[in-house]
């Protein structure tokens, strides 16, 4: 009986490793003030189209700021006033990819950007 429980636990553990959530950001770079940049986030390991998604950033002072939200179907988006009208979040559920188009960039937009589920 004990052996059977161990075997089931081992199988469940191995299955869990296969389902690891991964979010891989790309597209960053150096841009002058007033410039534009488009970030991408490739998602895997979960049903991307079923989840609302966001972009957050960490400033050089290590402060975390939320910058954009999009609903699972893409019909609803929200932004803080600091980026509204300059940043656009979008998604391609067929490609499991999240995007952030940033324009009219300012020095205060300098940060590390991360996508979040």
UniProtKB/Swiss-Prot annotation:
Residues 1-19 form the signal peptide. Keywords: Adaptive immunity, Disulfide bond, Immunity, Immunoglobulin, Signal. Disulfide bonds join 41-115. One of its GO terms (cellular component) is immunoglobulin complex. Residues 86-117 are annotated as: Framework-3. GO terms for biological process: immunoglobulin mediated immune response. Residues 55-68 are annotated as: Framework-2. SMART domains: IGv. It comes from the Eukaryota. Residues 69-85 are annotated as: Complementarity-determining-2. Residues 50-54 are annotated as: Complementarity-determining-1. GO terms for molecular function: antigen binding. Residues 20-49 are annotated as: Framework-1. PANTHER family: IMMUNOGLOBULIN HEAVY CHAIN. This sequence belongs to the VH7183 subfamily. This is Ig heavy chain V region 345. It comes from Mus musculus (Mouse).
């Amino acid at each position: 009986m004990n052996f059977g429980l161990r075997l089931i636990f081992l199988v469940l553990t191995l299955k869990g490793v296969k389902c690891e959530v991964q979010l891989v950001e790309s597209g960053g770079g150096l841009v002058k003030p007033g410039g534009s940049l488009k970030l991408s986030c490739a998602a895997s390991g979960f049903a991307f189209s079923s989840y609302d998604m966001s972009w957050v950033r960490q400033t050089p002072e290590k402060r975390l700021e939320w910058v954009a939200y999009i609903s699972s179907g893409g019909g609803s988006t929200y932004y803080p006033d600091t980026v509204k009208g300059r940043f656009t979040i979008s998604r391609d559920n067929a490609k499991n990819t999240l995007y952030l188009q940033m324009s009219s960039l300012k020095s205060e937009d300098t940060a590390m950007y991360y996508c979040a589920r």
